[in-house]
Amino acid sequence: MPSTLLSDRSGFTPMIARLIGMMTYTRETTLEAVQGWTPEELDLIPDGHANSAGMLLAHMAAVERIYQLISDGHPDPDGALEAHHWPGLNLGQQGRAEIRGRPLRHYLEALAQVRAGTLALLAARDDAWLDEPLPLWGDTGNRHFMWFHVFEDEINHRGQLRLLRRHQPGHQGLGTTGAWLEPLRDGLGVRCRMVHKGSPAEQAGLRGGDEIVAIDGVDVQAAYFHELRLGAAPCVSSTYRVRRASGELDLTVTRVARPG
């Protein structure tokens, strides 16, 4: 569950900390939209759509990277933008031709690498830098608006990802366990953040804070969380191997239909 508290963050000035909170929430919900997608699903461009999910993820990374350069005052951001980001920035025919056949991990790593650069940049700046007036789009803007625009653009494309999901049969009609799972650390592993009262997960004994080391016999300790295909139809069971201070135990949870 993404954090909904916009507050101070260690290593960042107050306004920048809250900006990062909004960017982080946006990114987490973006990755939820493509949880467990295969390369074929990431490449699909249904009728009426201009971009694949992979193209949109590459675009998010490219937009964030070029705004790093712009907000840091680079004299030639276009010239400095790395060649591998141009297909994602341009999309169109170039994007359709070049952004194909890649696993979800490729996009996860690209997004994480760019985000690490953004956090390093923002950690070295302060709120006065964020608010400083400067020319933008033929008018006067500031870096606060630039970084707002970065995650505003991502939110728009997240909506497109959710529309693309409707064209993926394997992601329709999924049941729920009532457990909210999340990465354990740095995008890797699986942790149960919370369990809804009365849900199948609670009835099976799963608890918030449990570290999940295997799902259906597959070790997930070093897995990229968002690569894992966690969904399944109602009545389908999964066995979670849980690690607690007292040791490890297996808990079997059977999904139910989602409310409504």
Language model: regions and residue ranges:
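Short, cationic motifs built from Arg/Lys/His that form the positively charged side of catalytic pockets
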Residues: 27, 115, 242-244
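PDZ/PDZ-like peptide-tail recognition elements
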Residues: 170-194, 231, 239-241, 250-260
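PDZ domains, with a preference for the canonical peptide-binding region formed by the helix
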Residues: 202, 208, 214-247
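PDZ/PDZ-like domain segments forming the peptide/carboxylate-binding groove
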Residues: 174-214, 218-221
